[in-house]
Structure formats: structure tokens, C-alpha cells
Amino acid sequence: TVLVRLTPELARRGLKVSTLKHAHHAFDIDHPAKDSFAHRSAGATEVLVASGRRWALIHELRDEAEPSLAELLLHLSPVDLVIVEGFKAYAHPKVEIHRVANGKPFLFPEVPNITAVATDGPVPATELPILHLDDIAAIADHVLRTAVERDTLVRELQALPIPERIRQSAR
């Protein structure tokens, strides 16, 4: 995906990046034969699995409402930039990723806050910047420019200024 190629490009530029992806379906990151799965099945609200290489916190919503984007962002450690996949209804800046082969219509202008379109085909008339799906450097440039121009949702939530290295990378 574009996000899988964008993340190392931003990291190469010296940024610490996190990603947040919305899943439209139920998912599991553990499996029935594992203790963590058994802990959740037994009623644990949260299960934290840790090793010397990584850790993961699994939170069961049970009867809770799905958390908002802002609530989810609060669970991330401070980083320079959070790239969000999905969450179309929220007011954060978005780059529309459009693949002709998927046969779906463009999201703009119906979806708010789209700041550019990255595609592998023709685009209806628009004033939005048009980027090629394979031009990851241009997509990274646009993301960083947008972060500097608009300030990011994470920075607003954390009331932190944009780190100088993002400002410098966006020039």
C-alpha cells in the first residue's frame, strides 16, 4: 500500500512516525491457542502482551461505543507525525488514494478535508494537487507541507508545536 511505502520515506527524513488504521470489520491480533486470547475470552477488558521486541495492548470494547479518532490518538506515544488510514468522516487532512483498478468513484469533493489526490489514472477537474501513486517522495512532501500549514490533529490534542525537523523537511 501507499502507507507502507510512505512510512519509511518519512522515517528516512528523520521523522518518528506512527500509523493508525481503521478496520471496518472485526479483527484479532491474537489466536485461540494463545494465553492472551484466553485472557480476553475469560473477560479481561485489556490484555497487554510484551516481549523483548515489542508489546501490544488489546482493549475489548464489549458494550462500549467505538472510540473516536481523538480518543484513539491519545493512546499513541508522542511522535513527530501520525498517518491515519480511514476515518473519512473526521476533519483531519486527507490524501485520497485512488486506484483505477478498484473501479470506485473518487471521494472528493464529497469527503471533507481532502488536500490532494494520489492516483494511477485520470482525475476529474479539481484544484486539488494530483500526485502519482508511485511518487512517494511527492506524497511525503505534500503530507509534511500540509502538517506545517494546518497543524496536525495530534499536535492540537497534545498542544505541542510542530517539531522543527518537520518544518525543515516540508520546505
Q: What are these model-predicted stretches?
A:
Residues R5-P67:
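N-terminal phosphate/diphosphate-binding loop that engages ATP/GTP or pyrophosphate donors
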Residues H25, R53-R54, F87-Y90, V100:
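Short glycine-rich anion-binding loops that position phosphate/pyrophosphate groups of nucleotides
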Residues A42-G43, E110-N113, T126:
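Short, structured coil segments at secondary-structure junctions
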Residues E60-A89:
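Phosphate-binding/switch loop-helix module in NTP-utilizing enzymes
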Residues V82-V84, K94-R99, N113-D120:
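Short, hydrophobic beta-strand segments that form beta-sheet elements in well-ordered domains
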Residues A89-E110:
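Conserved C-terminal guanine-recognition region of P-loop GTPase G domains, centered on the G4
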Residues I114-D120, P124-L133:
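Helix-rich interaction surfaces within compact, conserved domain-sized segments
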Residues L128-R171:
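C-terminal accessory "lid"/substrate-recognition subdomains
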